[in-house]
Amino acid sequence: MDQIVIRGGQRLKGRIPISGAKNAALTLLPCALLTDEPLTLRNLPRLADVDGFGHLLNQLGCSTTIEGSRPEDFGRVMTARATTLTSTVAPYDIVRKMRASILVLGPLLARAGEATVSLPGGCAIGNRPIDLHLKALEAFGAEIELASGYVKAVAAGGRLAGGRFTFPVVSVGATENAVMAAVLAKGTCVLENAAREPEIVDLCNCLVAMGAHIEGIGTETLTIEGVDRLHGATYRVMADRIEAGSYACAAVITEGDVELVGAKASEMEATLAALREAGATVEETKGGIRVAMAGRAQPVTLSTAPYPGFATDMQAQFMAMATLGTGASLFTETIFENRYMHVPELARMGCDIQVKGRTAVVRGVDRLIGAPVMATDLRASMSLIIAGLAAEGTTEVNRVYHLDRGYERLEEKLQAVGADIERISAG
C-alpha cells in the first residue's frame, strides 16, 4: 500500500493549479444518463472516484472516452454517451466503494422510469442516510421500495409526474438527485430549502445547457419544468474550492505565499473569511487567489454549516492549520457526527486538541514532530499532510488511497511550491 513521506519545515511559495472539482464532477457525470446524445465534460480531475464513476456509467450502458490520460496531463476531457441504457441496476460491488454512486438514482428513474441502486459506501464519517433523496423522489411520484440492501424506484407510467418537496434540513446529495430526476418529469417540480452549494449551481447550469428548464438557480427554491428530452452539451467542470482551501491552509501553516490558480473567490467566501481571521493575506489575482502568511496563525472560531456557511469539508484542514497557532481555536461540527477521526492522528505529532461531543478546542503549540500517521477519510488525510508540511522531521502518511479520491497529483503540486514530499509505492 502506498504511503506519502513528508520532510517538513519548508515554506511553500509559488503557483498551484487548482483542478476541476471532485464534488462537481461526480454530480455532472450522471447527467450523461439523461440523454442519448454525447455529454462532454472538460477540466475533469484525475481521481479514483471519477474513474470509478466512469466504470459505473459503463455498467449502465454508457460509453466513455477520455482525452488527456497521460500522467503529465491536467484537466482531462471525458465524452459520455448513453445511446441506450443496457441496465438500470447499480450493483453493490461498485456502489459500496463510492457514496456518490447514489446519484445515478434520479437520472435512471427520469430516463428509464425505474432504477435499482445499492445503498452507498464512501467515507466513514458517520451516519449519512439517503432518506431525503427518497422522500423527494416520492413527492415527485416515484414508488420506492427498500429490500436486500438496494433501493428500487419506479415512476408510474414510466415518467415522474412532478410535485413539491421541502427539505426539512439542507441536503446537498438529495438536492442533486432530485434536480436530475425532475428535469424529465411530466409536470413541474419545486424544491424548497434546497442546498445552494456552487457545485449544485454547476449542475443546474450544465442541465440548462442540455435543454433543462430550471429557475431559481443559486437560491433555496428551485423550480424545474420538465421537458420531453435533453440534448448533449459540452461543459467545463468548475474549479475545486475545497482543494483550493486545503492548499491555502498549507500555505498558512508553513508561513508561505501561494497563488491558487483557477480558484474563484466568489465560490469560497466563508473559507477566505476564515483565512483572514487567522491573519492571512488574501487577495484576488488575475488568475485566481493569493494567500500569504507572515508569522503564526491567529485563533479562529468556526462552526460548519450548509453553504454559504463554512464547509464541513474544510474543518479538518483548518484544524491542522490551527495546531501551530498562537492561541486556542474553537471548532464546532454541525453537519456530520464522528468527523473528528483525524484528531488522534494529529495528537501523535504533538497537537493539543480536546474534543467534547461536536466541539473541538485546538490550543496552538510551538512545534510539531513528524510521526507515522494513518488517514481515516478524505479530508482527514489532507489535514495530516498539512500538519506534516510544518512538522519537524519526517511524517509518514499511510492509507493514502483516501487522498487519491479527492486530490489530483497532490505530491507534484506541493513539490512545485517547495515541499519535500514524495509517494512511496508498495512493493
UniProtKB/Swiss-Prot annotation:
Any one of the GO CC terms: cytoplasm
Signal peptide span: none
Cell wall biogenesis/degradation found in the keyword field: yes
Catalytic reaction list: phosphoenolpyruvate + UDP-N-acetyl-alpha-D-glucosamine = UDP-N-acetyl-3-O-(1-carboxyvinyl)-alpha-D-glucosamine + phosphate
Chain positions recorded as phosphoenolpyruvate binding sites: K22, N23
Catalytic residues (UniProt): C123
Alphabetized GO MF terms: UDP-N-acetylglucosamine 1-carboxyvinyltransferase activity
Localization annotation: Cytoplasm
Record-given protein name: UDP-N-acetylglucosamine 1-carboxyvinyltransferase
